[in-house]
From Swiss-Prot:
Transaldolase is important for the balance of metabolites in the pentose-phosphate pathway. The keyword Transferase applies. GO terms for molecular function: transaldolase activity. This is Transaldolase. GO terms for cellular component: cytosol. Homodimer. It comes from Shewanella sp. (strain ANA-3). Pathway: Carbohydrate degradation; pentose phosphate pathway; D-glyceraldehyde 3-phosphate and beta-D-fructose 6-phosphate from D-ribose 5-phosphate and D-xylulose 5-phosphate (non-oxidative stage): step 2/3.
Length: 318
């Protein structure tokens, strides 16, 4: 019998949630996703030294201003890592817009344009890139404009149905609902343990998936942020699942037989009127878990972006 990972690949597109090229070679995913935390982690890998050196040298040629150099080096490093990953995956790379821009639509769009330009200068067409944006109202509005320009987006830090609905109504290419972080919040809040079937993160993604399919939305649902393989197995059949190296290894070493749990609707019905900004903000605010986890996620990505910039600043000074 095929291992659990190989079985899963027959129902769901598997995406590697890592910037580690060796892990990507090992598990042969379709796509890969990165974020500021993963770029920071990848920057510590000795094999990536040349990519960092290249980003530093390039940034120095763009500007004499140190703050601009840091910004340029950070963007160039993320793209350099993405370019290397794209040599190994047949699909797409997700590269994230600076989390500190999560509440600024125009600056998010400008950063997305810059990342796409850097990829194109490296010979990568925009059809192989997903721009990652936080699922704030401003991020969703930025994604709507980018999608209309033909730049596909991955809306991340998604914890609520309101966020998912707004993304679909904006015509976003893909969303990343965070399964494990939802579970973390509920375990902390209730003190209870949850089996995979009743896992609040699994329940949330299942609801979103079913809503999208019932209403004929094309937005791809990519479950993310897993805590155990039970969550992953319960979401077999989801459009995509992005999984970190340790859980990919556990799936590859497992012989559990799996069946698809999520299935597309046989018929579709028209959706209602799109959410207004006021409705979105109210519905989102009614979910304390989502409010907490979105804010925390943005803060933590911003912290790791800051750590990366400290490292780059030291290298730029040499």
């Amino acid at each position: 019998m095929a291992n659990t990972l190989e079985q899963l690949k027959s129902y769901t597109t598997i995406v590697a949630d890592t910037g580690d090229i060796e892990a990507i070679k090992r598990y042969q995913p379709e796509d890969a996703t990165t974020n500021p935390s993963l770029i920071l982690k990848a920057a510590q890998i000795p094999e990536y030294r040349a990519l960092i050196d290249n980003a530093i040298a390039w940034a120095k040629l763009q500007s004499a201003d140190i703050e601009q150099q840091i910004d340029d080096a950070s963007d160039k490093l993320a793209v350099n890592i993405g370019v290397e990953i794209l040599k190994l995956v047949p699909g797409r790379i997700s590269t994230e817009v600076d989390a500190r821009l999560s509440f600024d639509k125009e600056k998010s769009i400008a950063k997305a344009h810059k990342l796409v330009r850097l990829y194109q200068e490296a010979g990568v067409d925009k059809s192989r890139i997903l721009i990652k944006l936080a699922s704030t109202w401003e991020g969703i509005c930025a994604a709507k404009e980018l999608e209309q320009e033909g730049i596909n987006c991955n809306l991340t830090l998604l914890f609520s149905f309101a966020q998912a609905r707004a993304c679909a109504e904006a015509g976003v290419y893909l969303i990343s609902p965070f399964v494990g972080r939802i579970l973390d919040w509920y375990k902390n809040d209730t003190g209870k343990d949850y089996d995979a079937v009743n896992d609040p993160g699994v329940v949330s993604v299942t609801e979103i998936y079913n809503y999208y399919k019932q209403h004929g939305y094309n937005t791809v649902v990519m479950g993310a942020s897993f805590r155990n393989i039970g969550e992953i197995i319960e979401l077999a059949g989801c459009d995509r699942l992005t999984i970190g190296p340790s859980l990919l290894e556990e799936l590859a070493n497992s012989q559990v037989a799996i069946q698809p749990k999520l299935l597309p609707a046989s018929t579709t019905v028209a959706a209602g009127e799109p959410l207004t900004e006021a409705q979105f903000r109210w519905d989102f605010n009614q979910d304390p878990m989502a409010v907490d986890k979105l804010a925390e996620g943005i803060r933590n990505f911003a912290i790791d972006q800051g750590k990366l910039e400290v490292m780059l600043k030291a290298k730029l000074a040499n």
